[in-house]
Amino acid sequence: MVYTFYDASIVAAQQALGSLSHLVDVAEQQPNASELLTARLYEDMRPFSSQVHLAAQTIERLLCRLDNREHVPIEDTLATYEDLRQRIQSARKELDGTDKETINKRGDESAPTWLMPGMTVDMTGAAFASGASMPNLFFHLSMAYAILRAQGVPLGKWDYIQDFMKPQLPSAA
């Protein structure tokens, strides 16, 4: 099997959303579930709900870049667990609508790419994915996990990686 740009970006993003969805489910089952939505690692950091929003937005920004569309940010208004699930589902739906052949081709195409206010750089889709999108996605997934752990939510490494490992496991696992 050949590992492609599609696998490294789209499939990995789908797996990250699966992991994030699992974290949301576990958080909602906790006695302090309502407090977890606004929990932060540190006062100047974004809360758990925003980590979910930013992970989904990172995926949407990548897909816009690969589709040569302008990304229009969605306001961060997630206030309930249902809001979090809908945001994850929206990003999942966009990922599921991608075409493997098209994504693989777009990974090699170079275009002006917005990185932050005042910084647009000409780069390939693959360079944007590997240098910005995927690290940001994994950062926000990791922060969501860390926030929950800091609040005493009983999570282990398996809770984080299980969706990444599913393709390698026997179907009974």
Please provide the spans of the model-predicted regions.
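C-terminal or internal capping secondary-structure element at the end of a domain, subdomain, or sheet
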Residues: 126-171
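Amphipathic alpha-helices that form helix-helix packing interfaces
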Residues: 13-16, 20-23, 27, 55, ...
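Long amphipathic alpha-helical coiled-coil segments
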Residues: 68-82, 148-156
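Acidic interhelical loop/turn segments
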Residues: 31-38, 97-129, 161
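Conserved alpha-helical segments that form or flank metal/cofactor-binding pockets of metalloenzymes
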Residues: 44-72, 91-101
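Alpha-helical scaffold segments that form or flank carboxylate-/histidine-based iron centers
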Residues: 2-16, 35-57, 75-84, 120-136, ...
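Hydrophobic/aromatic-lined pockets within catalytic cores
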Residues: 21, 25-28, 56, 60-63, ...
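Basic/polar N-terminal segments that are highly enriched at the extreme N-terminus
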Residues: 1-10, 22-28, 166-173
